[in-house]
UniProtKB/Swiss-Prot annotation:
NCBIfam families: PRK00823.1-2. HAMAP family: Pterin_4_alpha. It comes from Streptomyces coelicolor (strain ATCC BAA-471 / A3(2) / M145). This is Putative pterin-4-alpha-carbinolamine dehydratase. It is an enzyme of class 4 (lyase).
Amino acid sequence: MPAEPLSPQEVEERLATLPGWSLDAGRLTRSYRLGSHFAAAAMVVHVAQVQEELDHHSDLTLGYHTVALAVHTHSAGGAVTEKDVELARRVEDLAAGHGAH
């Protein structure tokens, strides 16, 4: 069963619990700054592991000292769903362990 899109109000409610995350072009987005390129690359690998575990994959971009994510659900027509919120929460939890801010 495909994930159901969240209403605009539901998206705003979820974003209120995810500091640093925002809605941009219909996607949940967040950028993190890390202490080095290696630390950023390590975080990307960790995020990829979580994405595999959840079977839900975001657009994930590695920069010099940065990691950026854009999350939405393809099977829900590109809308934001609870799957996206769960992935954002999991990424937020692991980011602190990588020294991301």
